[in-house]
Amino acid sequence: MKKILLSTIIATAAVTVAVAQQNDQRLNKAITDATWYHKALKSAPSFRDLLKRRKNAVEQFRAIPTEALRPITIRAFATAEQRAGTRHVIIREHEYLNDSGYNNGGFDLGIGTPDHVISAIAGDLIDSYVTQAALKGIDIDSLGINIKQTGPSLQDWGLKYTIYIDSPASDSQLEELRLLAEQNSPLYQFSIRAHKVNTELVYTRSADELVLPPTYQPGLREFIEWETRKGEGNRKLRESGKRPDKSKFGGYAYDYPYSRANQFTPAQTDSYLSPDGPSAFINPSSGVTVLQVRHHRVLQDHPLYLGGNDLGPTAVESHIGLLGSCFTHVAEGTAARTKTPLDTLNVSLTAQFDPRAGRKGFEQTPLYPTDIKMRVFISSPRPEAEIRELVEKTEKGCPIYNLVTNAQVISGRIERVTARNK
């Protein structure tokens, strides 16, 4: 019996090693053999395959009885990560970091919130193009989007996007597709309207002096103090005509470039996507939307009941989460400028989203999120009245808060390209 068991173990190990070696050979061939790579690329699911899957998914969703659907409460949570100051966003089981570039005092650990929210809008738009093309029977071989902010103020973002598309459809069909995509994009429709954000402060008074064990690590209070010293030092150097030195203020990397440019371009969207600005593309194999800003990438996806794989938050969830992320970032800066010590800074957000929008009896129901509520949790040794004033200043200076509370103008155009893998 022992001999049989030993033989089985040896045989299993041999098969495992053989499979691993075969996979290594395939990987090496994919890396070194251009012909093999292009053959594999052409055998991968195409954009037209994605359109077929998307149409089936929409039809299956439409087959769900309206009475079986209910409004959804979107929940997101954002926190300022103590001594790093980065913003950590959690949406269901998904999470991501937002951070500033080096020249804005951050560590470039993630996309900055303004770029992230713009790319989230772009991702929702391009996803809407896919859905409407699938329903209209418009073939697409490649699709990508660039978007940029051209507006002059926090209240006026002036968003402009360019859709890069390879399609046999006529110009008039593509123009009709553009209009349908905008009409059915939740974030496009959300952004062109002004919304109220109901803000509630949950205040906790913390000790004036922190008394902690010797192993204590610097926290948010120390980060705010560091931000204050850095800001004051930079102001003095600017006033004297000198440029801030990266060796000062705790190693502040002011002289570093914003970040390295993105060198990667997806196979089916080619180099027309901007390497530096916010962009998005759809992965034909999974249908997931990939947001890209420089070398950072974040996924947006649909839940299973909408034909997705739930590999990331939805575009609507991302937008709500980014409101909290941006608020925490601006609150950090406001606290630093006003020399207000903070010990914790967390934001909890909810919004309502109704999947019945557009169905019979729900024609007037918005397809975008409504009833946005934001609870701001702050602990500080300063009195509550001072913290309430800080929250009000943060609202006025928060880019995404102003994006949400002011109606925006978004314009788009279509540019034809040729898919790289044809």
Summary of predicted features, one role per range:
Residues 120-126, 323-327:
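Alpha-helical metal-binding/catalytic segments enriched in His/Glu/Asp
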Residues 21-119, 131-321, 332-422:
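Extended beta-strand/beta-hairpin segments
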